[in-house]
Amino acid sequence: MAETKARIATGKVVSDKMDKTITVLVERTEKHPLYGKFIRRSTKLHAHDENNECQIGDLVKVVETRPYSKSKTWKLVQVVEKAAAV
């Protein structure tokens, strides 16, 4: 059986209100098929944060994993950059 490589995404934390769960906004650019203009697209992912270490504004790296719940199938790998303290 062939082993598949897990998908990794990098994004910004937009919500940390849930216990052990963060919402990560992942942005990407893609080219419009007809006009050729680059368009910014985004998606929100729910990720498992075991130690509740993330705060809003952090830049994080998440990896796809087994389902933790109905909508949570990603897991926090590392905090790339902490948000500036206000």
UniProtKB/Swiss-Prot annotation:
In this entry, which stretches build a coiled coil? Answer: none
* A GO cellular component annotation in the UniProt record: cytosolic small ribosomal subunit
Protein name per Swiss-Prot or TrEMBL = Small ribosomal subunit protein uS17
Molecular function (Gene Ontology), one example? structural constituent of ribosome
Q: Belongs to which family?
A: Belongs to the universal ribosomal protein uS17 family.
- Which one Pfam family would you cite for this protein? Ribosomal_S17
Functionally, this protein is described as follows:
One of the primary rRNA binding proteins, it binds specifically to the 5'-end of 16S ribosomal RNA.
Keyword terms: Ribonucleoprotein, Ribosomal protein, RNA-binding, rRNA-binding
Under HAMAP family, the record lists: Ribosomal_uS17_B
Subunit field text: Part of the 30S ribosomal subunit.
User: Has the keyword Iron been applied to this entry?
Assistant: no
Q: Which domain of life is it from?
A: Bacteria
UniProt GO BP: translation
The record's section on InterPro entries has: NA-bd_OB-fold, Ribosomal_uS17, Ribosomal_uS17_bact/chlr
Q: Does the keyword Ribosomal protein apply?
A: yes
